[in-house]
Amino acid sequence: MSDSKCDSQFYSVQVADSTFTVLKRYQQLKPIGSGAQGIVCAAFDTVLGINVAVKKLSRPFQNQTHAKRAYRELVLLKCVNHKNIISLLNVFTPQKTLEEFQDVYLVMELMDANLCQVIHMELDHERMSYLLYQMLCGIKHLHSAGIIHRDLKPSNIVVKSDCTLKILDFGLARTACTNFMMTPYVVTRYYRAPEVILGMGYKENVDIWSVGCIMGELVKGCVIFQGTDHIDQWNKVIEQLGTPSAEFMKKLQPTVRNYVENRPKYPGIKFEELFPDWIFPSESERDKIKTSQARDLLSKMLVIDPDKRISVDEALRHPYITVWYDPAEAEAPPPQIYDAQLEEREHAIEEWKELIYKEVMDWEERSKNGVVKDQPSDAAVSSNATPSQSSSINDISSMSTEQTLASDTDSSLDASTGPLEGCR
């Protein structure tokens, strides 16, 4: 590293077991989380005068997988612009040449909490439906550009105390082709759709299954399909939802179909029993109607056969959600992915390194006085959208205010390489 560059623009601080070498504009660094993708600190941006999250990517050039993931996250974050997607405020490296390049820092909005901290709260129907609406709007925005998130889970969804919600972590997101086959194990196990578990081709509504799992967790206060491994995860799904039909079985690879057909048969549990009235808010007759609608939405998202599962557009128009519908949010213009070969790219580590370095340098070129050119002037602050239907929604009372923009500590990727681990 150049001493002159480091001394004039950067300073170093020890954060847990990692050294953060950051621009001097970012002060008061405080670790708030870590995960497979990197370490995150809260900081104060002295240029913009706001609190931000600074994420140091974890060993981005350790191997081709890490490098491609880092490139993918950077490209997608630079493209998306939606109130329910976390905003990228800055990108930098303390190294001044490609030869020295080894660290990538992403600066993003800082939120108050992630959904892990909200799950154990008692949410009324207004708050729950509004959180889900925002989740679906963010996903719709990604899907409109052919981007599947693939790693939706409570720790990847962050909120403010006013109920504003944003989706983050795009290291596993990818652009989509119709009914394509991809790496089988991408989403954290508990939120993994059946078509992923079984190694089938999958499409955008793989994210809808994850939303259904998250909604179920918000309702029950606990993970709804908590498998101990890949096979047990499938067992937990069919024990509650029932063994899928012969029509679905025909879509499976022969070895997987043989395994699934030889498992014990389960009739499934009615959704009225999986999600009984008493676990929902029930203070009024209106709550009873909302409970019925919420349960119906769950029953349409948690469908084993993806061809019969609700789409994001249908979910946004569902009676439980549509009360919040705003075309400006739900039908926002799709992001323009400027790298058409984002998924087809395969490179050696050094080539990935050069691509990422160019992205970082491009950002620096477009930056001036701490604000990126052409970036909306309010992009540096969190959205304070207020649902027109109710003012009470704008407070998640007693929410922890420990600020966060961090994944949980578990890895998003499991080590297995095939459907049901080769059907043990």
Curated annotation (Swiss-Prot):
Spans annotated as Disordered: 368-424
What is reported on the regulation of this protein's activity? Activated by threonine and tyrosine phosphorylation by either of two dual specificity kinases, MAP2K4 and MAP2K7. Inhibited by dual specificity phosphatases, such as DUSP1.
Q: Explain the post-translational modification.
A: Dually phosphorylated on Thr-183 and Tyr-185 by MAP2K7 and MAP2K4, which activates the enzyme. Autophosphorylated in vitro.
Q: Which PROSITE patterns match?
A: MAPK, PROTEIN_KINASE_DOM, PROTEIN_KINASE_ST
The coenzyme or cofactor needed here is: Mg(2+)
Record organism: Homo sapiens (Human)
Where in the cell? Cytoplasm; Nucleus
Q: What is known of its domains?
A: The TXY motif contains the threonine and tyrosine residues whose phosphorylation activates the MAP kinases.
Name of the featured protein = Mitogen-activated protein kinase 9
In this UniProt entry, the residues modified to Phosphothreonine are 183
